[in-house]
C-alpha cells in the first residue's frame, strides 16, 4: 500500500472537486505523483491578484500567502490551463531549476496567446522550500 498526501482540485466556478493529485510520502513508491479525475485542470492555491505558474502542488501552496500558486503538474502548459490564467494582473513562471529553458518557452507561448504580463523568475532552489518572506522578496523587491 502507498501512503500519499492528496491535494484536491476544484472547479474555479462551482468549487466542486473535479480531481486530485496524490504525492507519495515514501520516496521509493512509484509513481511519485498520481493524478485522479480531470487531468487538465491545474491545482490552484491562494486568492491574490498576481499568480505564479509552478510545477507541483507544494510549490503552489508555498507561495499562496503572497501570490496565487498555479500548479500545472509538470512543465507542459496545456490549452485549458491558459483559460485559468486570464484573471491575473501579473503572471510569473517559476519552474524547477532544470526547466529554465522551458519556462522561457512557456512565456513566449503565453505572449503569442495574448498575455503581455509574463515574467520568468529562474530559481536557485525549489519554491516549496521558501518561506513567506523569501517569496515576498523574490517577487516584490
Describe the residue ranges of each PLM region:
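TOPRIM fold recognition
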Residues: 48-51, 57-141
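Phosphate-handling DNA/RNA-contact segment within nucleic-acid enzymes
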Residues: 1-90
Amino acid at each position: 500500500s502507498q501512503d500519499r498526501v492528496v491535494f484536491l482540485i476544484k472547479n474555479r466556478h462551482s468549487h466542486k472537486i473535479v480531481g486530485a493529485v496524490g504525492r507519495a510520502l515514501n520516496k521509493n513508491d512509484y509513481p511519485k505523483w498520481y493524478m485522479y479525475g480531470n487531468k487538465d485542470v491545474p491545482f490552484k492555491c491562494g486568492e491574490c491578484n498576481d499568480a505564479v505558474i509552478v510545477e507541483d502542488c507544494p510549490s503552489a501552496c508555498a507561495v499562496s500567502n503572497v501570490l496565487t500558486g498555479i500548479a500545472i503538474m509538470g512543465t507542459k502548459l496545456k490549452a485549458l490551463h491558459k483559460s485559468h490564467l486570464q484573471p491575473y494582473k501579473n503572471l510569473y513562471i517559476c519552474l524547477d531549476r532544470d526547466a529554465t529553458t522551458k519556462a522561457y518557452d512557456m512565456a513566449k507561448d503565453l505572449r503569442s496567446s495574448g498575455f503581455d504580463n509574463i515574467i520568468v523568475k529562474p530559481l536557485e532552489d525549489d519554491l516549496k522550500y521558501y518561506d513567506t518572506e523569501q517569496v515576498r522578496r523574490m517577487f516584490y523587491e
